[in-house]
A protein has these predicted regions:
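Helix-to-beta-strand junctions that scaffold the AdoMet/dcAdoMet cofactor pocket
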Residues: 223-225
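S-adenosyl-L-methionine
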Residues: 145-191
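Conserved class I S-adenosyl-L-methionine
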Residues: 115-124
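Non-catalytic substrate-recognition/targeting regions of SAM-dependent transferases
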Residues: 6-22, 29-96, 103
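Conserved SAM-binding motif I beta-strand of class I
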Residues: 138-143
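C-terminal catalytic and target-recognition region of SAM-dependent MTase-like enzymes
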Residues: 227-297
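Conserved SAM-binding loop of SAM-dependent methyltransferases across substrates and taxa
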Residues: 125-137
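Mobile active-site "lid"/loop adjacent to the S-adenosyl-L-methionine
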Residues: 146-148, 170-174, 187-218
Length: 297
């Protein structure tokens, strides 16, 4: 497991009974988490006294209750600054477990010894884009949601990177990659967080289990002749990490060599000293030693 254990402004205080108790800066929140299936005692007072709890409804969706948190605030991760805005579907704007991947990407870029061009697909609010730019990379940030790209720009500005070489693209990721291939554009690193399920711009259905292999084949076409790394997140519980490794090995390693590794991402739980699993990340690197820079459990 790759642990995101360098946070100061975020803390997973406790988890269990399908929820997590978290500190975001000075705000205490309770949010649903399907992985927290254990029925452990709730001794921390934050379970009862907090700034907001997201409660699921019986008909789907849900809402924030007992809200005393502001509409937005910022938290820091090192020199990165992120704007937190609790949304209608439990999310806050960043996934703190991804910090392990930000650290990995920044380390790869800083040790590359050459300019690195990063393509960030399904890039959401741009935490990875901002992290890579802070390490000196030029970044192409792509997401189909205009609001998410605007939020990502805010994060870049808050981090003092409003003038960094980041291209902000609102587009369907597959269509954009197809056009980049036709243009002859190439990238040294790719980060992608494809959804489990979705619909394309003309209504076509995306299912991760069915579309992941051809999508990896597609993005391999924009890699440079000297690629540095690929990070791919998969949150689909039915997709085994070894299956994703197999895809990366047969598509990327077959073409470029290198090394592929898949592990769970995790957040340390203060109350128990254990770790909450938060999905799977697959990393391909040109060097078999590259993943050793990460913190593992």
């Amino acid at each position: 497991m790759w642990l995101s254990n360098h946070w100061k402004d975020y803390e997973l205080i406790d988890c269990g009974r399908g929820e997590r108790l978290e500190r975001w800066g000075d705000q205490i929140l309770v949010r649903p988490d399907p992985q927290a299936i254990w029925n452990t005692p709730r001794t921390n007072r934050g379970w009862k006294v907090n700034n907001g709890r997201y409660a699921r409804s019986n008909t789907g969706g849900g809402q924030w209750q007992n809200k005393s948190m502001p509409e937005r605030w910022t938290i820091n991760y090192g020199n990165l600054v992120f704007n937190i805005k609790p949304m209608n579907f439990k999310h806050t704007g960043i996934f703190p477990e991804q910090a392990a991947n930000w650290d990995f990407a920044m380390d790869q870029i800083r040790h590359a010894g050459r300019p690195i061009r990063v393509l960030n697909l399904f890039a959401y609010t741009g935490a990875a884009s901002v992290a890579c730019a802070s390490a000196g990379a030029s970044v192409c940030h792509v997401d189909a949601a205009k609001g998410m790209v605007a939020w990502a720009k805010e994060n870049a500005k808050s981090s003092g990177l409003e003038n960094a070489p980041i291209r902000w693209i609102v587009d369907d990721c597959a269509k954009f990659v197809e056009r980049e291939i036709r243009r002859g554009k190439q990238y040294d690193a790719i980060i992608m967080d494809p959804p489990s399920y979705g619909r394309g711009p003309t209504g076509e259905v995306w299912k991760l289990e069915e579309n992941l292999y051809p999508f990896v084949e597609l993005v391999s076409g924009v890699l440079s002749d000297n690629p540095l790394f690929i990070i791919m997140n998969t949150y689909t519980t039915g997709l085994a990490p070894s299956a994703v490794t197999y895809i990366m090995e047969t598509v990327i390693s077959k073409k470029f060599g290198g090394h592929t590794e898949s592990q769970e991402l995790g957040l340390p739980v203060t109350q128990t000293g254990l770790a909450l699993p938060c999905g799977v990340t697959t990393r391909w690197t040109a060097s078999s030693q590259s993943s050793l820079h990460s913190v593992s459990r």
